[in-house]
């Protein structure tokens, strides 16, 4: 900041060549005496050192020289008044910068210091520079701290000491040197000050670490100024950080902002809300000094499924983590298109009820695909596959007899896909809306894990499924106070295909939810189910329409508690 440039302030007083009537021999206030026609003052047009200058004989104690101009005093502005002086003859005086502090009512603020450090002239002909810094601030380096009462000043210098000496004074300068105080004024450091290039090619990780270390030790924050910063390793900020520039880093590396762990920070860091969400979610599975990724009520538009295991780089985690307080929207994109494969396979229940063998084209079958075909029950999914052995592992046994048949494997696409986790326990999703827009399904659970929890969430218009379990990741799952709103509300009951929830394992707690016009609310394959206080209605607009099951139990020994539910236009 330089007020002379940015605001056009005129700081430097007129040169002596403009006339000595512009210079006061008193305080510089209106009506005070000037140096015009004074016997002890003269303008010298061609001094060897100064060019034009003022020659002044000291006849008063002190001998004052002040500009009549009113230099503004502005909070946050630092002024340096300087003058070059040399003794010509006679006694050698001392020289100091001086001023007159003027209040808004044009009275002198006598309580503030109005003189700067004194410099003794010791040799005739030697050029000496005197200066002083004036500001409203009392920071170190300020010679005259004036506070907020003075609003202007008349500046110049004083000659002190014995009278009789003659000096020459170069034009007095007043300059804005606020920039010299910026580092003390600012509570941040720039990564470029520590060697970061921001060219998108050079690895700036070491500079980021150095800036963070300095910021932590000095209780300031870090600024990532404009540029593109390549980080080729993990980087952790233990200090607060603000991004004007962006970062790029390989997918396997993490940016951990432990004091600014929020979507706004990661969006700024990576240049888009979608990439910011993915990167913020990535570090949730590591140490960020947080257990919750709070989206702050933000909406994130996703152009494709988020493979959470691939994003995190992990396949197991048993520590509690929470994604909360936001909305995920499925953008219009071909990335949501279902994938499908058809293969001939053999089912031998006497050998393994969960396995298909001799599967043709097994490489084309995606883990998480729903299996359909003769002898296949409800909500049977591919849990894993072995390309070399030509086998597919199923989430549930088939009801059909042994034999070789053709099966279809359909892979739905989900906003959040946890199927890459071998085991994930105690993960929670709270206060989230999954706005599927008929483009995508909502959440696919991990292969195994205990205590996955949904609370106060809305599943809006899933294309195929709301919550899908392809294994035992639903063991002890909580679904509390959620809404499931179908994308098929206008269709006849018999034409609907979407399912809100399926569960394979035991002990889910499904409570106080509202479910609107799906083909089915829940397909439950385990036992120990607890369904309390849910309202699920699956009617249509037909006069005498077909009714289907709201809840389907696929095993005979269900050991289930169904209490206080509103079962509307459907059955169990």
Give the residues covered by each predicted segment.
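Extracellular beta-strand/beta-solenoid scaffold signature
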Residues: 256-284, 304-313, 339, 351-354, ...
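Short carbohydrate-recognition loop motifs
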Residues: 34-64
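Extra-cytoplasmic beta-strand recognition segments
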Residues: 16, 60-97, 130-136, 171-172
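N-terminal extracellular ligand-recognition/capping segment immediately after the signal peptide
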Residues: 63-64, 205, 209, 216-291, ...
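Right-handed parallel beta-helix/beta-solenoid
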Residues: 175-207, 247-248
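Small/polar beta-strand repeat architecture
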Residues: 177-184, 255-278, 337-351, 360-367, ...
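Right-handed parallel beta-helix
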Residues: 292-297, 319-330, 369, 425-436, ...
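Extracellular beta-strand ligand-recognition surfaces/modules
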Residues: 131-167, 172
């Amino acid at each position: 900041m330089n007020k002379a440039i940015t605001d056009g302030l005129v700081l430097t007083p007129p040169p002596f060549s403009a006339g000595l009537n512009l210079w006061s021999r008193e305080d510089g206030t209106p009506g005070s005496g000037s140096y015009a026609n004074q016997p002890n003052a003269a303008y010298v047009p061609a001094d060897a050192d100064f060019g034009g200058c003022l020659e002044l004989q000291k006849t008063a104690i002190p001998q004052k020289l002040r500009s009549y101009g009113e230099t503004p005093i502005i909070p946050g502005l630092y002024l340096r008044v300087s003058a070059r002086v040399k003794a010509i003859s006679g006694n050698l005086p001392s020289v100091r910068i001086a001023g007159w502090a003027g209040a808004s009512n044009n009275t002198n603020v006598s309580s503030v210091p109005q003189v700067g450090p004194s410099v003794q002239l010791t040799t005739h002909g030697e050029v000496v520079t005197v200066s002083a810094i004036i500001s409203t601030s009392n920071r170190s380096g300020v010679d005259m701290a004036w506070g907020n009462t003075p609003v202007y000043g008349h500046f110049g210098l004083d000659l002190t000491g014995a009278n009789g000496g003659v000096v020459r004074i170069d034009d007095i300068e007043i300059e804005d040197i606020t920039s010299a105080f910026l580092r003390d004024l600012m509570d941040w450091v720039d990564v470029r000050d520590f060697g970061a290039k921001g060219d998108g090619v050079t690895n700036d990780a070491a500079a980021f670490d150095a800036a963070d270390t300095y910021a932590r030790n000095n209780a300031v924050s870090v600024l990532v100024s404009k540029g593109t910063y390549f980080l080729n390793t993990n980087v952790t900020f233990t200090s607060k950080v603000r991004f004007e520039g962006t970062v790029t880093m390989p997918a396997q590396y993490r940016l951990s902002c432990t004091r600014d762990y929020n979507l706004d920070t990661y969006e700024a860091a990576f240049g888009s809300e979608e990439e910011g969400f993915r990167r913020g979610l990535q570090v949730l599975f590591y140490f960020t000094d947080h257990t919750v990724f709070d989206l702050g009520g933000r909406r994130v538009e996703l152009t494709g499924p988020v493979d959470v295991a691939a994003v995190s780089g992990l396949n197991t985690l048993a520590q509690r983590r929470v994604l909360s307080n936001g909305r995920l929207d499925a953008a219009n994109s071909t990335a949501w298109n279902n994938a499908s494969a058809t293969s001939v396979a053999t089912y031998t229940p006497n050998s393994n009820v969960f396995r298909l063998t001799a599967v043709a084209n097994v490489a084309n079958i995606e883990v998480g695909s729903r299996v359909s075909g003769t002898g296949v029950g409800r909500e049977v999914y591919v849990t894993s596959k072995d390309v070399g052995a030509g086998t597919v592992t199923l989430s549930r046994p088939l009801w059909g007899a042994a034999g070789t048949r053709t099966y279809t494997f359909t892979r739905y696409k989900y906003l959040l896909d946890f199927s890459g986790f071998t085991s994930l326990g105690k993960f929670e999703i709270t206060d989230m809306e999954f706005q599927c827009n008929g483009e995508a399904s909502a959440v696919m659970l991990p292969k195994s894990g205990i205590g996955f929890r949904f609370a106060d969430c809305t599943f809006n218009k899933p294309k195929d499924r709301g919550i899908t379990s392809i294994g035992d990741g639903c063991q002890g799952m909580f679904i509390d106070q959620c809404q499931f709103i179908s994308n098929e509300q206008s269709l006849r009951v018999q034409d609907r295909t979407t399912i809100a929830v399926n569960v394979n394992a035991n002990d889910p707690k499904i409570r106080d939810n509202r479910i609107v016009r799906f083909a089915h609310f829940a397909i439950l394959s385990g036992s120990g189910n607890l369904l309390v206080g849910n309202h699920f209605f699956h009617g249509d607009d037909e006069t005498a329409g077909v009714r289907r099951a709201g809840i389907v139990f696929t095993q005979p020994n269900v050991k289930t508690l169904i209490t206080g539910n509103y079962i509307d236009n459907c059955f169990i």
